[in-house]
Amino acid sequence: MTLNQIVKKVTDYGSQHPQINFVLYGDIYDHLSQGEVNYPAMFFNIEDVSISAKQIQYTFGLYFMDRQIENTEELEVMSDQILTAQDIVAQIRNNANEWIVGDSIPMVLFVESEPDVLAGVKASISLVLPSINNRCQIPT
């Protein structure tokens, strides 16, 4: 499975979720500053890739966020976004035939004030896939 195929699957999971209105793979801050986001939103990007003898591991940062009325509903928005993150993680974990997901997925709560007042959660998730590492597969 390629990185493109993984991104497509994760994008589909987000797009099919009834409480996510906008999904994007790429630089979160570029899109936030352009004002093209329909909240609640899910952004994700690749943070790290590592190759071992028989595996390749992709680590993604998944950001779940929504607008909040300034400083009044921060806890409510964070709570909702944690639940949405759990749903997407469950979908990703359900795809065990293609990758392995670790038991623990660290999540960090955040608040942003520019360009919108946002609250949400970032989940760091690693997907481990088999990799043959066979030089005979190199195109000639």
Region locations from a protein language model:
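Short acidic low-complexity segments
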Residues: 25-35
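Charged, amphipathic alpha-helical segments and their flanking helix caps
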Residues: 1-26, 43-140
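Low-complexity, acidic Ser/Thr/Pro/Gly-rich terminal tails and inter-domain linkers that flank the onset
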Residues: 34-45
